[in-house]
């Protein structure tokens, strides 16, 4: 019998801005840890709901929360803390995590969201249990010393039809503790092209985290 899942949505206040979120939780028992899902420029938290990722994570025992980034989705009215393509202060995602009371989450970060996740990942004292970059932008804006200082285990994901995935991997492979999932025949949003492979790879990675 499939485990029950509770789903809800709402808004949080982050640095004076209202941000929309969707959440899925295990219907019973304590969640193992939290997973924060970010998104690309043409997407939103709805992507993760429609794909079934929120549901699959909650079924597997995780608290899964997807936010709509500032200026996008249902957070359209919120002003972004940095122009698109520039690194946002790491304090922005730290404030999101605090507002949602996530504890240190695993962060899933496709495409545009790299401008938020990479400064958060590499901030001094950052202790994320896991990081799943999916061809994120801004990988060239983090220096080698900052990559080398990251203790967080990473699952680097990209489609082999995505030139940006290969480019970002050239930088992300400097993360000391990483493994790679390359999806054959998949493009930039590789999780949409190969949802089963995405979910299997993601859940397998999470299972191995402490």
From Swiss-Prot:
One of its GO biological process terms is: positive regulation of transcription by RNA polymerase II
Q: Name one Pfam family in it.
A: Abhydrolase_6
Q: Is Phosphoprotein given among the entry's keywords?
A: yes
| E.C. code | 2.3.1.-
Q: Catalyses which reaction?
A: L-lysyl-[protein] + acetyl-CoA = N(6)-acetyl-L-lysyl-[protein] + CoA + H(+)
Annotated GO MF terms:
hydrolase activity; protein-lysine-acetyltransferase activity
May I ask which residue range the UniProt record assigns to the signal sequence?
A: none
> Where are the catalytic residues?
111, 162, 188
Its annotated compartments are: Cytoplasm; Nucleus
As stated in the Swiss-Prot or TrEMBL entry, residues carrying the post-translational modification N-acetylalanine are 2
* UniProt keyword Acyltransferase, yes or no: yes
Q: Please list the tissues where expression of this protein has been recorded.
A: Ubiquitous. Detected in spleen, thymus, prostate, testis, ovary, small intestine, colon, peripheral blood leukocyte, heart, placenta, lung, liver, skeletal muscle, pancreas and kidney.
- Listed as disulfide-bonded, the cysteine pairs are none
Q: Which PANTHER family match?
A: PROTEIN ABHD14B-LIKE (PTHR46197), PROTEIN-LYSINE DEACYLASE ABHD14B-RELATED (PTHR46197:SF2)
Q: What is this protein called?
A: Putative protein-lysine deacylase ABHD14B
Lineage of this protein's species? Eukaryota, Metazoa, Chordata, Craniata, Vertebrata
